[in-house]
């Protein structure tokens, strides 16, 4: 089980880097859901968050409905060797980011076991790099509809526009 701060950052990265939503497992965390929803309410976009009690059933259901599973792990194939094939596939994607002890079944259920380097590092970094490569950098200029708050890029200082 990852800590609350790491979970929050993982979900914020998913949202900011272009994911449509997340399924999360472990324990129901209403505070986590509220923190992320507040960001969506303030900063815009549509981002769905759903608790899933049984990760294995969710993964199997995703596959049976025609989707593909992309598991980010340091033991997988290097992203640079497979990202183009993943990008070109029309199937809906479920990206799985495991914690410290990923069950061996996950490696078997995944269509793709992908490494973002074959070194230990953060699951937040792995998701960031994967989404950046998947979207070919276009997520960096993504527009978020219904934003109440917007940053105005500055050479120096900070400027935020807040709409009521």
Predicted regions and their residues:
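RNA substrate-binding interface of SAM-dependent RNA methyltransferases
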Residues: 1-74, 135-140
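Glycine-/small-residue-rich active-site loops that bind phosphorylated ligands and cofactors
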Residues: 2, 28, 102, 119-122
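Short, solvent-exposed amphipathic alpha-helical segments in soluble enzyme
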Residues: 10-13, 39-41, 86-88, 111-112, ...
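Short, well-ordered alpha-helical microsegments
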Residues: 32-33, 55-59, 79-80, 103-104, ...
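Short secondary-structure transition/capping segments
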Residues: 33-38, 82-84, 126-127
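Long, charge-patterned amphipathic alpha-helical coiled-coil/hairpin "stalk" segments used as oligomerization
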Residues: 76-116
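Structured adenosyl-cofactor binding patch, chiefly the S-adenosyl-L-methionine
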Residues: 106-155
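Long, charged alpha-helical interface segments
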Residues: 155-164
């Amino acid at each position: 089980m990852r800590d609350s701060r790491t979970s929050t950052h993982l979900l914020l990265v998913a949202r900011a880097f272009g994911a449509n939503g997340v399924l999360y497992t472990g324990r129901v965390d209403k505070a986590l859901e509220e923190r992320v929803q507040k960001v969506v309410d303030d900063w815009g976009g549509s981002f769905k968050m759903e608790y899933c009690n049984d990760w294995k059933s969710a993964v199997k259901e995703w596959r049976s409905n025609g989707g593909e599973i992309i598991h980010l792990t340091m033991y997988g194939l290097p992203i640079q060797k497979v990202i183009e094939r993943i990008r070109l596939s029309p199937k809906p994607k479920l990206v799985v980011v495991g914690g410290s002890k990923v069950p061996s079944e996950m490696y078997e259920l995944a269509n793709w076991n992908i490494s973002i380097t074959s070194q230990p590092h953060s699951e937040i970094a792995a998701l960031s790099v994967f989404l950046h490569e998947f979207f070919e950098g276009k997520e960096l200029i993504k527009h978020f509809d219904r934003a109440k708050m917007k940053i105005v890029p500055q050479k120096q200082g900070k400027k935020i526009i807040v709409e009521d």
